[in-house]
Every structure is written in structure tokens, then in C-alpha cells.
């Protein structure tokens, strides 16, 4: 027979309050702040509308993380409406409740278990100073922030999102709609222009744009991109053109879009994945970007000679920590831009990914001196290149061992099936530098794959 754990005194007190709405509301002045999260969760679960509204107006923490309570869409919509009505009452008060510290309504989805952790009710996403001094010397109350993560598609917003946008729009500046992470999938400006006008674009820190087949979308979206002054991460993936444009029209779109990068002074991470529409014009994008990047990924793109020769010339590529050129075919391109790029970032580069670049012996030999200068390099992916054994040995022993004479080198067979091969042949030091894991205070481990013989796509 299992023994049921008896309720705690706090649980008994909360259950008693919830049975009497008037008593619960009147007690909000006196109950400990630590009771609020648990009491609020129970009130939402049982749809105690009056108690929920009153608790919002007396919320003793800077943040109300409602997103942690999202479980069922229909239930969430109803709870959200109740809370927004409570916020309406709070915003209309000339003198707010003495306990109220609410600055942020966080609607971002997060695990429910976080609800019971007090840090989630802290000041994340909100200003340290909830009020500023106006020209008259009196305090001006800052707007309440509503935090969301948005995914925009070709279809309209769902009913809950539409309701929220309309509610914010009707608050006349008393509420600010903020979005830290914005995803756009084949966006339709017809449906989303109003949202972009209302959204506090300064709040966007990460922007992902996928599957944009209509370049006009880039043209229309460009002014909004330029207003994302705190953007740190930008991912552009699968941008292509499905209808014909004159060269003049295409250049107009590209210029309007890439010129916005001049305003992205906080950008640290730039991922360009299969951006067919920008091929041959990436030099324009890099020219406008004046801030040094930490991460640059150019993946599966057919770089023009102009793109390739200019990539190392600009300030934005001078202090890279991570460089990813995966599946960019370099076979017929000069290794000189890559050599210059490595030298410029030699003191900062920690990871280099050249997987699938189909480089040849001569190209790797050309960049080896620059690789030796990359003293911080800890991860190097060279899978998918045509390299002979002598060059592999030079790469492993002259580059890797130079980084630390105490590195531990391990040889791992690259083939799971060794039929017909002599063990001695497999164990020869035919190696590829795959990864270096640095552990503070411990011996470095350098991982290699053994190659049986001849030239291979590794």
C-alpha cells in the first residue's frame, strides 16, 4: 500500500484561498511573494478569472513567464485573454498596486518545470530601470514588454497570434511586442506587414530566413532588416528565383537588401546556405558589413571568382573564430583567398570546416603555412577532399604536432570492413586531421582516421 504525501502548509493555505475568490484577492497584499507562482498556476488550471486578473495587477516579480504554462492551444488562448484583460486594468491605473513589479510578459515556450525556479521570474529580457526621467523631470513609465518567438509563413497568423497583435496595437504604446528569435519561411508581406510594423525590431537578436523563392519579398523586407539594430545572428537558407527578372531588376533587389547590412553593427554570426539568388553578389553583402564577424558559414554555394577573391578583403572577415565552407567546391578556384583569410584570422580562428570542398594536393599545400599560424585552431573538418598520403602526413605532423608537442595522437581505421587488407597496411600512419579536443589542464587528444592506400575522397 502506497502512502500519499500529506499536503504542505503552503498547499493547504493556497487551496483555502482558491475556495473564496474575495478572500484570495484581498490577501494578495499580504501573502509572501514565493506563494505567487504556485497560486497563479493553480488559479490558471481552474480558470479562476477574477483571481488571475488580480494577481497580474499585483505580480511581485519583473517577469511573468506564461510560456512555461503552454500545454494545450485552446486552454492557452483563454488564459492569455484573461491575463491581457488583467494587464489592461493594470495599464489603466494611475497608481499601480504597491506590490506590482511586472515589466515583462514572457510568452516564449519553455518547459513547465522552469515555472518552479525563481530565476525565470527575474529581469531577463527587461530593462534594469523600469522608469526613465522625462523632460519635465517626472518619471515616465516604460511600456510593458510582451516577449514572443515568431515563425512567419506564407499563411496568415493563427487566431491567438492575431489576437495578440491586435491587442498590442490597440494599447497606444503602453505595450511593446518583442521577439528575440524570428523565423521566416516563404513569408507573405500581405499577411505580415502589420506585425512587422508593430514589432519592436530592436528586440530581434536572431533572424532565420528559409525558402524565399520570390526576390520581391527580400525587397519588401529590406527596410525591416535594417531596423534590427541588435541582430546578432542571421541565417539565410535556400534563397532562389523562380521567375525571370531583368539584370537591372535583380540588381535593385540585391542592392536594397544587402545595403541594410551596414546598419547591423551587432551582427556576430552569419550563415549563408544555398543562397543561389545572391551568387555572384556576395562581395556586395560583405562590403556593406563593417562589423567583424565571429562566425561565417558559406555552405553549398557556387561561388563566383569575384565572390571568392573578395571574401578575404573585407573587415567583416578579419577576426573570425569559426569558418565553415562546407560543400563549397574549390577545385577550380585559387587557394590564395583562403590562405589570406586564414592568416587574417590566425590569432582568433578556433574551428575550420572544409568538408566536401574537393580540394587537391596543390591547394592544401598552398594553405599549410597559413594553417600553421592558426594557433587557436581546435577543430578542423577535412572530410571530402582529394589528398595524397604525403600531404596528409605533412598536415598531421607539421600542423597538429606543432600546436602541442604533448598531443596524444590516436589512429582509427576508416573502414569497417578490412577484407583482403593486411593489418600492417591498415596500421600505417596514413592520417587525416579530423578533430582536436582541448581540455583545460589535461593532455590534448588529436583524433585521426587511418586510410588504407592511394588517393581517396575522405
From Swiss-Prot:
<feature type="repeat" description="LRR 2; degenerate">
    <location>
        <begin position="176"/>
        <end position="200"/>
    </location>
</feature>
<comment type="function">
    <text>May play a role in acrosome development and also in sperm maturation and motility.</text>
</comment>
<keyword id="KW-0433">Leucine-rich repeat</keyword>
<keyword id="KW-0282">Flagellum</keyword>
<dbReference type="GO" id="GO:0001669">
    <property type="term" value="C:acrosomal vesicle"/>
</dbReference>
<dbReference type="InterPro" id="IPR050694">
    <property type="entry name" value="PRAME_domain"/>
</dbReference>
<dbReference type="GO" id="GO:0045596">
    <property type="term" value="P:negative regulation of cell differentiation"/>
</dbReference>
<feature type="repeat" description="LRR 5">
    <location>
        <begin position="264"/>
        <end position="289"/>
    </location>
</feature>
<keyword id="KW-0963">Cytoplasm</keyword>
<feature type="repeat" description="LRR 6">
    <location>
        <begin position="290"/>
        <end position="321"/>
    </location>
</feature>
<dbReference type="GO" id="GO:0005737">
    <property type="term" value="C:cytoplasm"/>
</dbReference>
<dbReference type="InterPro" id="IPR032675">
    <property type="entry name" value="LRR_dom_sf"/>
</dbReference>
<feature type="repeat" description="LRR 3; degenerate">
    <location>
        <begin position="201"/>
        <end position="227"/>
    </location>
</feature>
<comment type="similarity">
    <text>Belongs to the PRAME family.</text>
</comment>
<dbReference type="InterPro" id="IPR026271">
    <property type="entry name" value="PRAME"/>
</dbReference>
<dbReference type="GO" id="GO:0043066">
    <property type="term" value="P:negative regulation of apoptotic process"/>
</dbReference>
<feature type="repeat" description="LRR 4; degenerate">
    <location>
        <begin position="228"/>
        <end position="263"/>
    </location>
</feature>
<feature type="repeat" description="LRR 9">
    <location>
        <begin position="374"/>
        <end position="398"/>
    </location>
</feature>
<keyword id="KW-0966">Cell projection</keyword>
<protein>
    <recommendedName>
        <fullName>Preferentially expressed antigen in melanoma-like protein 1</fullName>
    </recommendedName>
</protein>
<feature type="repeat" description="LRR 8">
    <location>
        <begin position="346"/>
        <end position="373"/>
    </location>
</feature>
<feature type="repeat" description="LRR 7">
    <location>
        <begin position="322"/>
        <end position="340"/>
    </location>
</feature>
<keyword id="KW-0969">Cilium</keyword>
<keyword id="KW-0677">Repeat</keyword>
<dbReference type="GO" id="GO:0031514">
    <property type="term" value="C:motile cilium"/>
</dbReference>
<dbReference type="GO" id="GO:0045892">
    <property type="term" value="P:negative regulation of DNA-templated transcription"/>
</dbReference>
<keyword id="KW-0968">Cytoplasmic vesicle</keyword>
<feature type="repeat" description="LRR 1; degenerate">
    <location>
        <begin position="99"/>
        <end position="126"/>
    </location>
</feature>
<dbReference type="GO" id="GO:0008284">
    <property type="term" value="P:positive regulation of cell population proliferation"/>
</dbReference>
